[in-house]
Amino acid sequence: MTTWQGWHRFATTDPPAPPQPDAPPRSRDERLAYHSAFVTIRTPAIHTLVTQVRTLMILGRHQQTTARPSLIVTGPAAAGKTTALLHVGRACHLAHTRKNPAPPGSAHAVVPVAYVLVPPGATAKTLVTEFARYLSIPIAARMTQTQITDAVCHTYTAAGVQLVMIDEIHRLNPRTTTGAQTADLIKDLTERLPATFVYAGINVTDTPLFTGVRGAQLAGRATLITCGPLPARHGTRHPFRDVITDIENALDLTHHKPGTL
């Protein structure tokens, strides 16, 4: 999914559908394939992220002078951060392409969303190269970081990218020279691209990402959304029980008794 072709295929492929009461039973192989992919359960974090992204994208259209506000999705490993990110990205992609379809006969597809992974040991040049790879921007061996960045900003703006999602952001360490340069690159991109940025990473508040001058710049523009343990009760709602109920309703098991999970 870290290329436009891969992302487009993901976003436009129908997600797994839970079994319907009037549908014929699925085969064992079909049920195994379904549970392997499974449905996305709409957790409180996903609900919050969807609402916040929609709001920031609307606000960002009217902000021209400085970097737009951003979001950071944080939490422990395997807490659903990437799942939340991909769910929101797909929703944004589908909503935008419905409202703004490519003109008939156009060779240029609408590109509303970009998804980039921070590579291990990322430098500013390797990260901006990942941005270039997403849209298949030609990169010559002798191109400098500045030249690649200029090409990325020009192409992303021309393609109409509105949402940039950067995953594995915890891999950045602004206390190191390379980490500081990479953080500066991200700041530069947020100021030059007319897009909303959403980051995801493991427990980012416990990392150097939020400390020091560069960390303060990033944190100062970002709203934190935590993917953590679900509370048993929140006001009049029961988030943990609600999620378990949604999971159970989505199961396709032949001998499972509803209500026992």
Regions found by a protein language model. Give the residues of each.
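Conserved lysine of the Walker
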Residues: 81
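The catalytic "switch" region of P-loop NTPases
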Residues: 171-175, 185-260
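Conserved NTP-binding/hydrolysis module of P-loop NTPases
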Residues: 111-140
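Post-Walker A helix-loop "phosphate-sensing" segment adjacent to the P-loop in P-loop NTPases
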Residues: 91-103, 137-139
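Conserved P-loop NTPase "ATPase switch" module shared by AAA+ and STAND
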Residues: 155-178
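Hydrophobic anchor at the beta1->P-loop junction of P-loop NTPases
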Residues: 73
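A short, basic N-terminal segment
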Residues: 1-69
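Hydrophobic positions on the alpha1 helix immediately C-terminal to the Walker A/P-loop
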Residues: 84, 88
